Design a protein with these regions (language model features):
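Conserved glycine-rich cofactor-binding loop
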Residues: 48-49
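Conserved glycine-rich Rossmann-like NAD(P)H-binding loop of the short-chain dehydrogenase/reductase
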Residues: 62-78
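Conserved NAD(P)H cofactor-binding loop of Rossmann-fold oxidoreductase domains
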Residues: 124-129
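Substrate-binding pocket helix/loop in short-chain dehydrogenase/reductase
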Residues: 132-134, 140-145
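Active-site helix of classical SDR
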Residues: 156, 192
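Residue(s) in the substrate-gating loop at a strand-loop-helix junction
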Residues: 176
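SDR active-site lid
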Residues: 206-270
């Protein structure tokens, strides 16, 4: 039996909890269960900070037991403790790097083997990289594709099949305003978010009569650790717009998911991007994206050598 879906205002969401970054050993997949597991859960990826952290708070505030996953074990443990104390819900931690090829399968195997039925799936984990395509660190670009596209697609596939079998369930995929156009100097990221939007719309249609919904939310600039991790801090995309808080975006995405909306654009920039996608020539939107990404359209190369980037993303 499905529970009701009360929707709390953003000011009812628990604040994010800062936590220092642990060493790389915490990236190994581990799982901690407190108490027996016998109810339907919400699964949120990239739940240790930012939008994912706020979505985890929303589900907990509305009485849902949750599974939270990210790479950073210490941060996940902090979130687990805070949500259990504040909302008296079960919080299961599964620490793993979802860009590893077998990680989505291991996550699904874990929940299945422990009798955890995932009624709500939130694919939030992802990251970006600001650099010229040919100047990028290829291993980082490959990691981005695996996390932003492959992990999301596999989790949607595996848990979507479970939901279809059960006759109910909701999937929320976080895309971006970047999904609407080609993005010079962030080519792989923009392409990955277009993949998320296209996949979400197609699967939503296929599942239209099954009791399972797929919602794709396309946010604009949001105040998380995303820009710093992507080496974008101070670029036009953030300086010429007014970013919303992770809490505001999470509340919007939660409402849209619960309503079963297929495609949702959050904020004026994203709605303007959707309009530009329909009305402007592709050449114009490419130049616009290049400018908003902080590079000039006629610049041949952003940097002579790949830049070092912090290994931090929405999946931390």
């Amino acid at each position: 039996m499905q529970r009701p879906h009360p929707i709390l205002s953003p000011d009812r969401i628990a604040p994010s909890i800062p936590c220092s970054r642990p060493d790389a050993s915490t990236l190994e997949a581990t799982a901690l269960i407190d108490g027996e597991v016998d109810m339907a859960y919400a699964l949120i990826t990239g739940a240790s900070s930012g939008i994912g952290r706020e979505l985890a708070s929303l589900f907990a505030a509305n009485g849902y037991d949750i599974v939270i996953t990210a790479r950073n074990q210490e941060r996940l443990n902090t979130v687990q403790t805070a949500l259990k104390q504040q909302y008296q819900v079960r919080v299961v931690v599964f620490a793993a790097d979802l860009s590893e090829p077998d990680a989505p399968q291991r996550l699904h195997d874990f929940t299945t083997s422990h009798g955890i039925s995932i009624e709500y799936l939130v694919n939030n984990a992802g990251f970006a990289d600001w650099t010229g395509y040919l100047d990028a660190d290829w291993s980082r670009q490959q990691k981005m594709m695996r996390l932003n596209m492959e992990a999301l697609a596999e989790l949607t596939y595996r848990y979507g099949r479970d939901m279809r079998r059960a006759g109910h369930g909701r999937i929320l995929n976080i895309s971006s305003v970047a999904s609407m156009m080609a993005g010079p100097y962030m080519a792989v990221y923009f392409a990955s978010k277009a993949f998320v939007r296209s996949l979400s719309e197609a699967v939503a249609y296929e599942l239209r009569d099954t009791g399972v919904t797929v919602t794709c939310v396309c946010p604009g600039p949001t105040t998380t650790g995303f820009a710093k991790a992507a080496n974008m801090h101070g670029r036009n995309f953030f300086t010429m717009t007014r970013p919303v808080s992770a809490r505001q975006l999470a509340a919007y995405a939660y409402r849209r998911m619960m309503r079963g909306t297929t495609l949702a654009y959050h904020g004026p920039l994203t709605r303007a991007g959707a309009l530009a996608e329909r009305l402007l020539p592709r050449a114009a939107t490419r130049r616009l994206a290049a400018f908003m990404n902080g590079g000039e359209p006629n610049t041949r190369s952003v940097s002579a050598t790949p830049q070092a980037h912090p290994e931090r993303s929405a999946q931390d």
